[in-house]
């Protein structure tokens, strides 16, 4: 998959030295505006939808945003950006921010999405990859971009390219298996904790090791976190899953369209939204988890998952 870092030395690099605020020293730089727009979503759940009715239901359940997806998942084959007609219909139907996905490296799809005035563009490996060698230069767009990552190096390379929000990605198959998401979130958070205890020479060496821009690595050390909003994605299907991601240090969660399968999707979505907002209150989480025994009935975690446990590195 494409993983090429930008070579423009300082273009769009976030420079923040104000506690945990995510800002840009150049207040008139468009990137600071895009990062600020992404920060508005902190503490929320972003729900994948493939119809207007699903978008309305997600909004009524309290989703902070909806991400429009190609509804033909079941056909297999190449997945692309959603039909512009569907995007326009969703935008007319809801008042929450609307996101849409473009294939990795497909800057023309991104141009089309920006012309449709979507609020955010997700350059997504969840759909098909258009360019194996290049990511989109996100500084060329007015719209804030979201990019997936599985570790700190990937996250910082995507930020250097102009990503205003990071999606820590786990399972891509909509099976409801949260294990890979937990692994990747813990890996990223763990690397940041180790980074916090490094001296300047060690930071430089670490930046080379993970192939990340030194200035962003140093910035991450100072902040104690990656310098943009970070959401978790993949296998998050219950209130407990959502609360786990928040307690591990994420700013919010993506909820896949599989949440609409089975009975009472509104109740499931509402419970997940409440869990994100009250992730440290086990009494609220117990209440939100009650009566959801059918929430996972349409999801099939890979049967040999338990046998695999302990066989690989942790």
UniProtKB/Swiss-Prot annotation:
Entry keyword annotation includes Acetylation: yes
Location(s) in or outside the cell: Cytoplasm
Major localisation: cytoplasm
PROSITE patterns: PDXS_SNZ_1, PDXS_SNZ_2
Example GO biological process: pyridoxal phosphate biosynthetic process
GO molecular function per UniProt: protein heterodimerization activity
Residue positions where N-acetylalanine is found in the record: 2
GO cellular component, one term: cytosol
Assembly and oligomerization: Homodimer or heterodimer with PDX1.1 or PDX1.3. No interaction with PDX2.
Function: The protein has no function in the formation of pyridoxal 5'-phosphate.
Family: Belongs to the PdxS/SNZ family.
Protein name stated in the entry: Pyridoxal 5'-phosphate synthase-like subunit PDX1.2
This protein's encoding gene: PDX12
